[in-house]
Curated annotation (Swiss-Prot):
It is an enzyme of class 3 (hydrolase). This is ADP-ribose pyrophosphatase, mitochondrial. GO terms for cellular component: cell junction; cytosol; extracellular exosome; mitochondrial matrix; mitochondrion; nuclear body; nuclear membrane. The gene is NUDT9. The keyword Acetylation does not apply.
Length: 350
């Protein structure tokens, strides 16, 4: 009798401990998920604050902007150690290399003149005619007539390949759909238990890296127009289509780009083209084709600056141009799609 009572007591205790364990794990996972959601929505905001700070700890947010050689050249930047990236860190011996590409100095319509030219008086930190010189991250400083990169030193002054002094505004359309099997059912990742999201990626001609199909905002152009135009040019080769084909593409893109969308990020981008005086900023927007019907009727074809184009499964193994991997990660989190096998498996198993 005593043995049976002891057995029941032990079973009850074991059940209580098991339930407590599940409760704790569930609570922990909910906490982790809540943290992830909060983190994903503020990651770039926090990073931007760090970049515009002065403590010199920039290794995670200002790395590609210090790489050498500078893209499309043999120019080597002056080396900038992590602890001396921030402008408020005194560095009297800082001697950055001066470089502006010949293609920029040739004076194309998308490029500013040199600061030294007498007839050039840019209005920094404001709208300058049709040119947007305001930064999405707030005011930036001007030193000796040149704007100063809010993220810190890059080891190179001038504009490099960038046309504008100060912020150079771009737009990155992230087009997504669910990965489906031959029967049209959404495919779930076997470890995370979350559905697999795909996005349209292009292989850049200039550097050979895979990227989001985006591009520069033309003077006076709305961001929404840039997003649609760039996707059409790079992922659908719209520039080489007949008038009738262009109209058909436009109709289908209008349907995709006029629906609800997610603004993933606005602001400074850690880009290998950045210099001390010119830098990239972007607005990354996610347009999701929930059923896949819109994109099924559009044939992907690389065009303009793209060498290749394809649908790519989204996961943490992606290696993309500039900060594009972080944009894609945020999309996966916002859409509650698969990203990593490691971080989500425990919580999904509950």
């Amino acid at each position: 009798m005593a043995g049976r009572l002891l057995g029941k007591a032990l079973a009850a205790v074991s059940l209580s401990l098991a339930l407590a364990s599940v409760t704790i794990r569930s609570s922990r996972c909910r906490g982790i998920q809540a943290f992830r959601n909060s983190f994903s929505s503020s990651w770039f905001h926090l990073n931007t604050n760090v970049m515009s700070g002065s403590n010199g700890s920039k290794e995670n947010s200002h790395n590609k902007a210090r790489t050498s050689p500078y893209p499309g050249s043999k120019v080597e930047r002056s080396q900038v150690p992590n602890e001396k990236v921030g402008w408020l860190v005194e560095w009297q011996d800082y001697k950055p290399v001066e470089y502006t590409a010949v293609s920029v100095l040739a004076g194309p319509r998308w490029a500013d003149p040199q600061i030294s030219e007498s007839n050039f008086s840019p209005k920094f930190n404001e709208k300058d005619g049709h040119v947007e010189r305001k930064s999405k991250n707030g005011l930036y400083e001007i030193e000796n007539g040149r704007p100063r990169n809010p993220a810190g030193r890059t080891g190179l002054v001038g504009r490099g390949l960038l046309g504008r002094w100060g912020p150079n505004h771009a737009a990155d359309p992230i087009i997504t759909r669910w990965k489906r099997d031959s029967s049209g059912n959404k495919i779930m990742h076997p470890v995370s238990g979350k559905h697999i999201l795909q996005f349209v990626a292009i292989k850049r001609k200039d550097c050979g890296e895979w990227a989001i199909p985006g591009g520069m905002v033309d003077p006076g152009e709305k961001i929404s127009a840039t997003l649609k135009r760039e996707f059409g040019e790079e992922a659908l080769n719209s520039l080489q289509k007949t008038s009738a084909e262009k109209r058909e593409i436009e109709e289908k893109l209008h349907k995709l780009f006029s629906q609800d969308h997610l603004v993933i990020y606005k602001g400074y981008v850690d880009d290998p083209r950045n210099t001390d005086n010119a830098w990239m900023e972007t607005e990354a927007v996610n347009y999701h084709d929930e059923t896949g019907e819109i994109m099924d009727n559009l044939m992907l074809e690389a065009g303009d600056d793209a060498g290749k184009v394809k649908w790519v499964d989204i996961n943490d193994k992606l290696k993309l141009y500039a900060s594009h991997s972080q944009f894609i990660k945020l999309v996966a989190e916002k859409r509650d799609a698969h990203w990593s096998e490691d971080s989500e498996a425990d919580c999904h198993a509950l």
